[in-house]
Amino acid sequence: MDHTLHLHVPFESARLADIAARALAPDPLLRPEELSVSFASDGASLNIKLAAIDARVLRVATNSIFEALKTVVETADELDF
């Protein structure tokens, strides 16, 4: 796939990064032939790798991941993780 994006999202702790990776990973991709996504925690960072067939698919996927990540962070804040 021609378009890639690697994100490194810092968290306050390795535990929160791991929770975020596990919370985001289960969502199945609707078109795996157009997009691949991986989530991995590395210490207190969440590493996200995306690869897409074109810029539009990458942009839409990135927006979706940021929305989901926002929900994970807000939930962790509310639950005082």
From Swiss-Prot:
Component of the EKC/KEOPS complex that is required for the formation of a threonylcarbamoyl group on adenosine at position 37 (t(6)A37) in tRNAs that read codons beginning with adenine. The complex is probably involved in the transfer of the threonylcarbamoyl moiety of threonylcarbamoyl-AMP (TC-AMP) to the N6 group of A37. PCC1 functions as a dimerization module for the complex. The EKC/KEOPS complex also promotes both telomere uncapping and telomere elongation. The complex is required for efficient recruitment of transcriptional coactivators. Keywords: Activator, Chromosome, Nucleus, Telomere, Transcription, Transcription regulation, tRNA processing. GO terms for cellular component: chromosome, telomeric region; EKC/KEOPS complex; nucleus. Component of the EKC/KEOPS complex composed of at least BUD32, CGI121, GON7, KAE1 and PCC1; the whole complex dimerizes. It is found in: Nucleus; Chromosome, Telomere. One of its GO terms (biological process) is tRNA threonylcarbamoyladenosine metabolic process. The keyword Transport does not apply. The keyword Transcription regulation applies. Belongs to the CTAG/PCC1 family. InterPro entries: CTAG/Pcc1. It holds the Pfam family Pcc1. Its main location: nucleus. This is EKC/KEOPS complex subunit PCC1. The gene is PCC1.
